[in-house]
């Protein structure tokens, strides 16, 4: 539920790289009082996690880019949708500056809204939450945590971690490692022993992290 009292949801693209039809590759919202549905943002291939900044109330979301270009391109991304009607490029442009080899011909990435940050190629960002608790240090307040599920179609695997992201009022991004250690052998099979999926803040300020590889929920707390 957004700060405007409307329920937001993502409808992903129906394939790796296709021309989306009505409401596909978008974030939409529905007014529970009237049942009216409207598209809020387009050009979003597949957003699994989104949340609103506690101070600015801007919508932030993660996005999965297309596969099968190469190991390093394109990056999965983090976006800020500060207003209705923004278009983030799919299927014509990825990561703000990479025209799609198939659909990008004759189009410019300058036509679309750029991401706030590139997160890494095939890194699979899933759940994300802004932190509003008081257990962690004060400089964690209003930061977001993003669960990186990790790559599967990349020769050298990456991700499999949780990162902390600080953003300012203009949307500038700083990213820091928070929970690491799941990735043990980037070229191994399997390369990891855990895969973060989502993050959730508890009433006491602790953080829960789910791991669908082991079927475990971890609780992360802080003490001075």
Which residues make up each language-model segment?
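Glycine-rich beta-to-alpha transition loops that act as phosphate-gripper elements at the mouths
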Residues: 41-43
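C-terminal substrate/ligand-recognition segments
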Residues: 200-213
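Loop/turn residues immediately N-terminal
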Residues: 66, 214-215
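Beta-sheet entry/capping signal
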Residues: 6, 58-59, 206, 216
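Hydrophobic, small-residue-rich alpha-helical packing segments that form membrane-like cores
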Residues: 1-7, 29
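Beta-propeller domain segments
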Residues: 13-18, 22, 28-35, 45-46, ...
